[in-house]
Regions:
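N-terminal cap/lid segment of alpha/beta-hydrolase-fold proteins
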Residues: 28-61
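The alpha/beta-hydrolase serine catalytic core
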Residues: 49, 151, 158, 163-301, ...
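Active-site glycine-rich loops that stabilize anionic/oxyanionic intermediates
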Residues: 65, 72-77
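Conserved alpha/beta-hydrolase
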Residues: 88-110
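Alpha/beta-hydrolase fold nucleophile elbow
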Residues: 136-147
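Glycine-rich nucleophile elbow surrounding the catalytic serine of serine-hydrolase chemistry
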Residues: 145-155
Length: 307
């Protein structure tokens, strides 16, 4: 009997060592800094939505997994002029998940651009938030929107079905009504009004190499994003560059005033005086600094309200 016990002892020791090794492997896995971005298709109301998600490592998550939805601008895509991917990397280190999507007719979307409307964009944001909640248990949610994506983000608390905690607006096209389309002909607003009239009469109109539907024009005409911001009173970060060009001084002034009137509104301009509407520059060093500053300001704002 003593001999049998001696035979089993080494196996018991090996089993214990193996269990310890598995625990170490599991711990190391949890301590990985973040997961890689993953391209997926999210079911939407009109078909699948091309999207990229990025989740923090489990060790970086709190009890609730915050979410940021990144919304690109007119004729843009989910790369966000090169800013979205690195910002998603920044956010996961703070335990915040992200999803960035291509709206109708943009990026990898197979829909016609005629489906690009404010209502459809809000529905797509509904779909991705719902998917992230159901699949990953996300909680507090913020939106980041650039240009037309900023207008959408401003309006989403009115148009969407999910509550949001905060909004970050990069150079939003927030002119009232059709003024939000001023970028189509910044020096001649009468031309914008003419395009809108043609869309109303013909069902759509070509501009900037895409087909704009009457539904898109109607949504723009009927919306007032700055009034929506003031009505909801959410925490809002607003940035504009020093060389917007396609957004009028009036739009910028009115939007700044709207955000500054909010209890927790923040306007940041100085770091971006040398940038264009997309927060880029032909000078490589300036371009790099613009991206770094835009991400830093935005991440600081988001973490302060989501954690």
């Amino acid at each position: 009997m003593k001999h049998a016990k001696q035979t089993r002892a080494p196996w018991i020791l090996l089993a214990c060592l193996a269990a310890i090794a598995l625990c170490i492997v599991a711990a190391v896995t949890l301590l990985q800094p973040n997961t890689n971005p993953k391209n997926i298709e999210i079911p939407g109301t009109r078909g699948n939505i091309p999207a990229t998600i990025q989740l923090p490592a489990k060790s970086a998550r709190g009890e609730e997994l915050p979410l940021v939805v990144l919304c690109h601008g007119f004729t843009g895509n989910r790369q966000g002029d090169g800013h979205f991917a690195p910002m998603a990397e920044d956010l996961v280190t703070h335990g915040i998940a992200t999803v960035r999507l291509d709206f109708a007719g943009c990026g990898d979307s197979t829909e016609p651009y005629a489906n690009y409307t404010l209502a459809n964009m809000a529905a797509d944001v509904d779909s991705v938030i719902g998917y992230m909640q159901a699949t990953y248990g996300t909680g507090k949610t913020a939106l980041v929107g650039h240009s037309m994506g900023g207008r959408l983000a401003s309006l989403y608390p009115q148009l969407g079905q999910y509550p949001v905690t905060a909004l970050a607006l990069w150079s939003p096209a927030n002119g009232t009504g059709l003024q939000g389309l001023e970028f189509l002909s910044i020096d001649n607003f009468a031309a914008v009004e003419e395009l809108a009239a043609r869309a109303d009469a013909e069902g759509s109109v070509a501009a900037w190499g895409v087909e704009l539907s009457a539904a898109y024009i109607d949504g723009m005409r009927d919306s007032d994003p700055n009034a929506a911001l003031q009505e909801r009173g959410l925490p809002v970060l607003l940035t504009y560059s020093g060389n917007e060009r396609i957004l009028s001084d009036t739009t910028q002034t009115e939007t700044k005033a709207a955000v500054e009137s909010l209890p927790d509104g923040q306007v940041v301009l100085e770091p971006f005086v040398n940038g264009d509407h997309n927060y880029t520059s032909e000078d490589p060093a300036t371009n790099t600094q613009l991206d770094a500053d835009l991400r830093q300001v935005t991440v600081d704002f988001l973490t302060s309200h989501l954690q």
